[in-house]
Amino acid sequence: MSTQMTMRLTWQKRLKRILFSILIKRLFLEGGKSRVTRLSAEFVFRMHAKYPSAELFHSREKLWNTFGKHLSQQQWIGFEFGVASGDATKTFLKMPYAEKCLGWHGFDTFMGLPSEWGDLPKGAFSTDGVPPQIKSDLLKWHIGRIEDTCTTINSLSNLDKNFIVIFDFDLYTATKAAWDVVVNHLKSGDIIYFDEAYEADEDQIINEIIESRQVNLEVIGYTTMGIAFQIKS
């Protein structure tokens, strides 16, 4: 590809981001009726200021699709903290790089939120304690409170492989409990994704991780709600 064409594509991508940012900014400044819209707008501008070279994706699925190239064809295992109806699980197991997946571990009570969160009531996302019916030999459900189930991670096999870790518990306490265990096994090349980074709970966790310097994080990209990082040595 010629230098001129590369520059043109780079500029087009930049222009697309700028136009999208202007739209979100307008919604934010005009005080959109939706609380989520306002928080999402604020999140986009905060991330753009903090990570100016990071790519903004218009959907989490498009962001997830890029994980394959970051894994560089390596074998990996997945950890999903907060499963609910299993939409994310299904999506990841259909990704092109899923052929390198050695196992997918989903952690949830399947009883919904244990307390109110944002605009949602206690019990939101409940499936009455029943995990989603997904046919895959890769799946292993860990049902119960994360404080009780997360230590099973320490005895799992293939912990030397790369990780894809999805944090979608929404609440600070549960996310922190999961992080405190999984961080002991993180290594260079692992990918971590926060699905509700625009909300205060996950934002607090992310800031604490960065400030603690337990791991060296490099941004892969973000959406209007979530953000993905890769662990670097």
What are these model-derived regions, one by one?
Residues 1-54:
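Membrane-proximal basic amphipathic "stem/tether" segments
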